[in-house]
A protein has these predicted regions:
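E1/E1-like adenylate-forming module used to activate ubiquitin-like modifiers
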Residues: 2-3, 24-103, 110-116, 144
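Compositionally biased, intrinsically disordered low-complexity segments enriched
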Residues: 6-22
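Generic signature of intrinsically disordered, low-complexity, basic-rich segments
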Residues: 106-108, 588
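Helix-biased "structured C-terminal domain" signature
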Residues: 32-38, 42, 55, 116-618
């Protein structure tokens, strides 16, 4: 037999599972033609199954799934549908495969003899071009084969306030996150869950955006990272993407409880303590929720009351901000209080930071409280951003937004002169907040965000018409037209909006940055994060407020990204909402004494008066 004939015979032997030229027994490789990722063909090998299938023009080998493990071809099919949406192929294109059958057989043969290489991975052969690509795979939370009935999605281990959690380095984190590892585990342009990551070279800081796919919803959530280096910005961008996806919908497999508050009052959180909507907006075209009464049924999930130390039911659409459909939602909710961390305790601490930050801003905004200004000092990073703003004629003010909850909170306010606003170079007002136990980190978080928003405005207007403040002019006369985040920021970007926020540029006094930071640590080296969390919880409890924690952790994300996810809810704190008719301030007693909750706070007008003007929070 000549060499060509021998090669042909070897190929046939590999397909048929007979002995090849090297004397080894070749497993029979099933053909992918006629199989799909939803209904793959499999080969038992190495204590598991190797999947093969067609996905449009792609001939796919993998993943290899050990027995009793997760991550299969069906997961890959679900992710591809999520990533590509309506463009994802439903049917294979078998006519192209014969051209590449031998190549595919070689790939499959190699996989069969080293299946562990395709654990949570797959190889795709594009039958249009012959290109071979390798892809990482994360088990899909909606895969009924891997997680039947949601079994296996929950992450074991509840909130533990006794076990020490040592801080890594001098940052307030319990583990360091590696950019390369997150890229390898999360980023894949075909199979997600992070489908795309990109940088903005024109930003004053190294701005990175990560588009993370929401499982089962073909919607991408944006995660953002800002720092002095693009490589450093990728880590927070990846993690914020995970935070928004796990916080939007329930991927934990945990059961829900159906009923009204009246039915479940002994075990449930009273929605009135969360702040209700104003009845005047019930039935308004911009109000897309059900009017609340204790008899309105909805779905609930279990959380943990840190004050009462017991399980407590929380409305699912409060715990997960995208949850629920019309007819089941009576409260508008945002991602406020969602956070991720290397441990559950770390996630809770950062979720609490966010609730405190938003609550403080809304207290000051709706009460029109004048605040103390913080002198900028000589910090080189802060000076750099201040110089960039000065070059554009923009003015930066730092305000002390620290409330009675006692965590350092800074408000950065950037204002533009009339000429710059009229010419479209900048919005009249940009602002952002930051909260952290390290006052410098609080200040820098606020300044970095608002400086980026103000300086990038001309570019973003060119990219998205919705950013242009001019389109918001009618909103000054009719607040019900304010529906989205960009409406909120856009309306206050108009020069004519100044009367609504003049109190923010009229500070009561000036304190040195050292005064803002007095008694606060700048390094957490050697600290115990659990102890710090206990201190903050005790401080909140001392005010008669609870901190309710909903564990949003989902096993596929915890395994891939190494983080736990939570939603922190503080009944009595003001919730962040978007849309004028969605404001939730009714039944929140703290708002009536808001000006007294800030050191040096003075109401612009009358103490206790509430000004229901849409906020400018980004």
């Amino acid at each position: 037999m000549d060499l060509t004939a021998q090669n042909r015979q070897d190929r046939q032997d590999r397909r048929d599972g007979r002995e090849g030229r090297d004397g080894g027994v070749r497993p029979r490789i099933p053909s992918p033609v006629g199989a799909t990722l939803a209904e793959p063909r499999t080969l038992r090998v190495g204590g598991g199954v190797l999947h093969v299938a067609m996905s449009g023009a792609l001939a796919v080998v993998g993943p290899w799934t050990p027995d009793a493990s997760t991550g299969c071809a069906r997961c890959a099919g679900l992710w591809r549908r999520d990533v590509e949406g309506d463009t994802a192929p439903d049917r294979p294109v078998p006519g192209l495969f014969p051209l590449w059958a031998d190549v595919f057989t070689g790939l499959a043969d190699a996989a069969a003899h080293g299946p562990e290489e395709l654990r949570l991975a797959l190889v795709a052969l594009d039958c249009r071009t012959g290109e071979v690509t390798r892809h990482r795979l994360v088990p899909h939370p909606d895969c009924s084969h891997c997680f039947p009935g949601g079994a296996g999605l929950a992450v074991p281990g509840g909130l533990d306030l006794r076990t020490p959690r040592p801080v890594v380095g001098d940052a307030l984190r319990t583990r360091s996150m590696d950019r390369a590892d997150l890229r390898a585990r999360l980023l894949d342009f075909r199979f997600g869950p992070a489908a795309h990551i990109y940088r903005d070279e024109e930003s004053p800081l190294s701005l990175v955006t990560c588009e993370t796919v929401a499982p089962g919803h073909t919607r991408r959530e944006g995660g953002y990272g800002r720092s002095t280096r693009f490589s450093d910005s990728e880590v927070p961008a990846f993690l914020e993407g995970v935070e928004r996806v796990t916080g939007g919908h329930r991927h934990t497999g945990a059961p829900t409880v159906s009923g009204s508050y009246a039915d479940l009052a002994d075990e449930a959180l009273d929605p009135e303590r969360l702040g209700l909507h104003e009845p005047e907006w019930y039935g308004h075209p911009a109000f897309d929720l059900v009017p609340y009464s204790p008899d309105v049924p909805t779905s609930w999930v279990w959380g943990w009351s840190t004050l009462e130390r017991r399980r407590i039911l929380v409305p699912e659409h409060v715990a997960y901000w995208h949850a629920g459909t019309e007819g089941t939602r009576f409260l508008y909710e945002s991602s406020n209080g969602c956070a991720v961390g290397g441990t559950l305790e770390e996630a809770v601490l950062y979720g609490l930071f966010e609730v405190v930050e938003r609550d403080a801003f809304l207290l000051a905004w709706y009460s029109r409280t004048r605040l103390r200004e913080i002198a900028t000092g000589t910090d080189p990073d802060l000076a750099h951003l201040t110089d960039l703003l000065d070059e554009r004629g923009l003015r930066l003010r730092l305000l002390d937004l620290t409330s009675d909850l006692g965590i350092p909170t800074a408000l950065a306010v950037v204002t533009a002169p009339e000429e710059a606003v009229r010419s479209g170079l900048a919005p009249a007002l940009s602002l952002a907040t930051g909260t952290h136990l390290d006052p410098r980190r609080a200040v820098m978080a606020a300044v970095e965000e608002t400086a980026t928003n103000a300086l990038m405005y001309p570019k973003w207007v060119r990219m998205r018409a919705s950013v242009d403040v001019e389109r918001c002019r009618p909103m000054l006369e009719d607040f019900t037209l304010v529906r989205t985040l960009e409406d909120h920021t856009g309306m206050h970007g108009l020069w004519e909006s100044r009367r609504h926020w003049e109190f923010l540029v009229s500070p009561t006094a000036t304190v040195p940055v050292e005064g803002f930071a007095a008694g606060r640590p700048s390094s957490f080296a050697g600290a115990d994060l659990t102890a710090l969390l206990r201190e903050r919880l005790d401080a909140v409890h001392a005010l008669g407020l609870d901190v309710v924690v909903v564990d949003q952790s989902s096993a596929p994300y915890t395994d891939a990204a190494g983080v736990r996810s939570v939603k922190v809810v503080v009944p009595g704190a003001l919730p962040m909402t978007f849309g004028h008719t969605h404001r939730r301030t009714r039944s929140l007693e703290r708002l009536t004494r808001a000006s007294t909750l800030f050191e040096g706070g003075v109401p612009w007008e009358r103490h206790g008066q509430v000004h229901p003007v849409p906020h400018p929070f980004p």
